[in-house]
Every structure is written in C-alpha cells, then in structure tokens.
C-alpha cells in the first residue's frame, strides 16, 4: 500500500501469474484510459449535485444527498487487491466491495467508480470529484490533517517476494541488510520508509512501478527481493515458478513495531457520513461479515484489526 503523496464478487484474481498480470494491466493503464470518460460522465451526470459544497454544519449533509440520489462515487486508484476494475470492466476490490455493503445499509443502493492516480485521491476528494476514498488508504498523521478517516478495516504487515526456496534466507529487513540484499519496492510504497528505517539508503532501493514489475525483477535476478504489503506479495507471487512470498512480518519504525491500517477517507466537513459509516463497519466487524467480504481478495484473519483511526492519527 502506498504511503507518500502517491503513498489496493467472483474471486478478483486467478490462481496463476498470468491472471495477476492481466488484471494489473486493466487496473493501471486501461482503468485510467478506458474509464476516465465513464468516471467523468458519472461525476458530471446523475451525481453532479454532490459537488455542492457542504458547510459542515451538524456534520454535513452529504449522507442525505447520497440517499436521495441512490449512488455514491468512490475514488479508486486501480491497485489490486484494494480497489480496481476487473477484466470485465466491473468495479471490485476489498474497499469497493465493503463500500457496497455499508452504503446499502445506509440507504445508498449503488456505488460508482471514479478512477484516478493514487496521489490525486485526497486532492480529488477535497475538490468534490468523488464522495469517498475507497482505496485501502493507510491512515497516517499527515493524511489525518487533510481528511477524516473511518476506523481501519484491515491492518497490514510487510512481506517479501524472493527467489524460489529463499536462498538468501530473507525474512526481515534486518536479514536483507545483513546479506547486502538488493531491494525493490513500489513507487510511493510505505515499505520505502520501512527499509530506510532498517538502515538502507533510499538511493540504493530499486523503485518499480508496481508489484508485477517487482516480481519480474526478482524472477530475472535484477534484485534479491521485492517488498510490499503481505496481501499484495501473496497475490503477485502466486503461481510463479521462480519466486515465492515470505511469511508476513511487522517492520520497525522509530524502533517500534508498525503495521499500518487501511481505511476509507472522507472530507473533513462530513463527520456525519463518516460516523454512520463507522457504525456499520463496527457491526460488520463484530459479526464476522467484514472478514467474509475481504477474504476473497487475499486477506487473512491475521489482518483483521480493532485499531481506530484516532490511534493511527496520533491524537
């Protein structure tokens, strides 16, 4: 999952690498090219009146407007497994599927994707290009100054893609540093910070566009490992004849274990919508339905969490 300014219900991925790569091409390139018109048309069409600014009085009135319109626009960034368009042109992913269930309970029948680059999600949200960020976005103190978050729906450790058999014995960043391993990770990924905290120089990291490029780098021997979120790594390494994923581990940041939590983001004026969303999220968490919704996207019970946005925002 991405950290910086650029920072993821049939099963979303097949059981082989070809499917992962095919899905990825649809979510990175054709998502923006093929659906830009769709997203723009939707934003200017039936949902256009959601562009009316809310004063934030009494927590904002966006929830009422969404109920009246029957549709909510979701900002997505085309990242498997968090929020993307599948091979058939359908919106799916951990966050959109969860959004469908929660907004249905809130009286909003439909969700509509608005594809954008990851770094444009928060600016686009605050510019009212869409109503909520549904991209599995990590909750960080910096982001908490720009948007308000629901409580996290998952907590994610790191993992590596390594060559089959893990010949260098790479299980943590400390292992990688000791073995002088060459590391690749994705553009804007939180794992850049995690590797730097472990002692790597950022200039020594190989930055690739995405997890598929990272897998290719490991398979070709250009790097010793690719690091990403545990779920991303599991999915991209599945079916590879030359690479495998390691067990998840929690990185150390400022000397303390840190597993990031991903959540939905809302405009700061829309506390009423955020609170209503949170109430339904907590019900799903307690009933176990939350896990059943996200499990098809590669999530495990170990990645479910009771963390709050307040904890992650640092206030």
Language model regions located:
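A ligand-binding cleft/hinge motif common to bilobed small-molecule-binding domains
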Residues: 136-145, 196-197, 224-258
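Flexible hinge/capping segments at coil-to-helix
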Residues: 65, 163-182
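N-terminal secretory signal peptides
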Residues: 1-26, 37-44
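Short loop->beta-strand "edge-of-pocket" segments that line small-molecule binding or catalytic clefts
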Residues: 71-78, 82, 173-191, 224
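Ligand-binding cleft/hinge of the Venus flytrap
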Residues: 85-86, 99-109, 189-209, 237-242
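Extended ligand-binding regions for polar small-molecule ligands
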Residues: 50, 96-105, 166, 174, ...
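Periplasmic-binding protein-like
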Residues: 155-161, 240-279, 300-315
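Extracytoplasmic small-molecule ligand-binding "clamshell" domains
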Residues: 57-135, 145
């Amino acid at each position: 999952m991405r950290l910086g300014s650029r920072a993821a219900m049939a099963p979303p991925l097949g059981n082989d690498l070809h499917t992962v790569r095919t899905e990825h091409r649809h979510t990175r390139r054709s998502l923006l090219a093929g659906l830009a018109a769709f997203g723009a048309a939707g934003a200017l069409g039936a949902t256009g009146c959601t562009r009316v600014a809310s004063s934030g009085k009494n927590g904002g009135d966006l929830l009422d407007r969404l109920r009246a319109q029957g549709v909510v626009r979701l900002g997505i960034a085309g990242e498997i497994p968090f929020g993307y368009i599948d091979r058939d042109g359908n919106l799916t992913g951990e966050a959109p599927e969860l959004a469908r269930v929660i907004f249905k309970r809130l009286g909003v029948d439909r969700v509509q994707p608005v594809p954008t680059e990851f770094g444009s999600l928060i600016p686009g949200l605050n510019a009212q290009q869409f109503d909520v960020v549904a991209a599995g976005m990590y909750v960080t103190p910096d982001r908490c100054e720009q948007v308000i978050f629901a409580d996290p729906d998952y907590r994610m450790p790191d993992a590596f893609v390594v060559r089959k058999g893990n010949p260098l014995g790479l299980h943590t960043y400390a292992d990688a540093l000791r073995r002088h391993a060459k590391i690749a990770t994705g553009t804007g990924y939180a794992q850049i910070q995690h590797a730097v905290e472990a002692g790597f120089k950022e200039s020594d990291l190989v930055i690739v566009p995405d997890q598929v490029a990272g897998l290719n780098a490991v398979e070709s021997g250009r790097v010793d490992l690719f690091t990403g979120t545990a779920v991303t790594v599991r999915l991209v390494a599945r079916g590879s004849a030359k690479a495998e994923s390691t067990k998840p581990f929690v990185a150390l940041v400022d000397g303390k274990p840190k597993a990031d939590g991903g959540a939905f983001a809302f405009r700061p004026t829309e506390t009423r919508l955020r609170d209503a969303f949170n109430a339904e999220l907590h019900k799903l968490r307690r009933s176990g339905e939350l896990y059943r919704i996200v499990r098809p996207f590669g999530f495990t019970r170990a990645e479910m969490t009771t963390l709050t946005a307040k904890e992650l925002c640092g206030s």
